[in-house]
Amino acid sequence: MLVISIDQIPRSPEELIQLSKYIPSFVLSVLPIGSVWIAHSSWSRIFGLQDRFSVFLSLLLVVLVLVFVYPMKLIAQITVEYFSVIFDWNFLSTGLFESESWSSELVWVIFLYVAIGLIFLSLILIAFYQNTLKFGQELSITEEETKHCITFSLIWGVVAGTAVLSMLIASIVSPENIQLAGYIYFSLFFTTVVVPIQYFKYRPLTPS
């Protein structure tokens, strides 16, 4: 609860219930950060490359994740609040849209922050895999491991591309349609699967 509330501990049942409304947005904000951590952990476990460039990328990744935490948490709160209004889920509403500090005119800035963060995080992860391919002979990388590197480079490339689209949408549409900049991310459930499949369909590692 301290992690969710950051600066306050619930001192009554009412405060505990109110604070619990932030749990869904906290979980939602952890998902992209968790995905980045899993990707880096998987890369490190499989390849374990420790050259200077990989160490630099690891440090840069840590810095970006720490910077990325607050925009991601805010966009997660907005997402949960949005769906609580759409579906009349009052038990999840935190009153964010009614607060004095809320400005619908500036929501696009939050989408911009999140998109830029995702783009840079994706580029760093792509750099990990592409740098690994450069050390293919030294690491005795197998064909399956080569495919692994290419696959995840494509996946994170799709994430970066989707973030660019979200940023463009957020910059163009009116505040009333700003949710479109968020809806575009749902396409990742489809594109991150289809793009690698199509890539290897037309560019197989072993020519038939």
Identify the role of each PLM range:
Residues 2-208:
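Multi-pass alpha-helical transmembrane bundle typical of ion/small-solute transporters
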